[in-house]
Amino acid sequence: MSKKIGILTSGGDAPGMNSAISFLAKSALSLGFEPYLIFDGYSGIIARKILPAKNFPYNGISSFGGTAIGSSRFPEFKKEEVQNKAVEILSEIGISSLVVVGGDGTYNGGYKLHLKGIKVIALPGTIDNDIQFTDYTIGFDTALNTIVETIDKLRDTANSHRRCFVVEVMGRHCQDLALYSAMATGSEILITNTNILTPEEVSQKVLEQFAKGKPSVIVTITENILPNLKEFAAKIEELTKISTRSLEVGHTQRGGRPSAFDRILAAKMAMKAMELINQDKSGLAISYLDGKIQTFDIAKVVSKPVRKTNDLVLEINKINQN
């Protein structure tokens, strides 16, 4: 078995990726392996942006947000000839094992390399929390805390002016960021891909909340639902005659120093990944499920649809409107 191991981050960046990189490199060295850092995701393999970890200050990056080795979306990697080229380049360098950190696109790319003989272990690194068979992904907790802090501040000013705020958060097609931020902040109205409401329906609920004496109303919405957030807020103001503002939390959700939870989660997953590589395992995804670090076949993870939590969405809406 070759002692050279590649480490890459791919797709959207997530707080805690640097913790994973650092612990992967340190764990690899402790087991007698030679870790290599691959810059800018899968495109970095093709561009030969590959550097021995010993030539990079990986020890001091755990507390920083983002990913110090860069990331990218590389749709060309879906082509078999590009995958074959990646295998050829990795083989030339002597890298026979690869740890990939990212979301479902990263998992799919890693699985393709696994089928072509590269030993691959995947770690879930995405703020969206949309990877199957794991309760939490690296970056979700930090992003959630960013959203909660933002909504808490909006609540302060909304209370002062008797306003309604419509807040759009990330999550792609997974509603976890919206759902759990609504739980944490008491957002009165929650709109997700399993609970879509019209401006008329939202306006009625907003009026009901103010009629109960509430000084403000927060509407939390998952991205990719509304064609235009500002127009949606303007329509609510038109129908209710209540001052309504909109805010897209945006890419601040991706940044910031990772929470202690994300750093520890990344470290534990990295240690497990290196344990599996030391056992010559491949094609496995690391997860945190039911309070334990576990492993699942990557093929099984990418073949399952994102879990739905509609019952909880409806329950939170009901509770927060009282």
UniProtKB/Swiss-Prot annotation:
Pfam families: PFK (PF00365). It is found in: Cytoplasm. Substrate binds at T126, I127, D128, R163, M170, G171, R172, E223, R245, H251, T252, Q253, R254. Its main location: cytoplasm. ATP binds at G12, R73, F74, G103, D104, G105, T106. One of its GO terms (biological process) is canonical glycolysis. Its EC number is 2.7.1.11. Allosterically activated by ADP and other diphosphonucleosides, and allosterically inhibited by phosphoenolpyruvate. Coiled coil: none annotated. Pathway: Carbohydrate degradation; glycolysis; D-glyceraldehyde 3-phosphate and glycerone phosphate from D-glucose: step 3/4. Homotetramer. Belongs to the phosphofructokinase type A (PFKA) family. ATP-dependent PFK group I subfamily. Prokaryotic clade 'B1' sub-subfamily. This is ATP-dependent 6-phosphofructokinase.
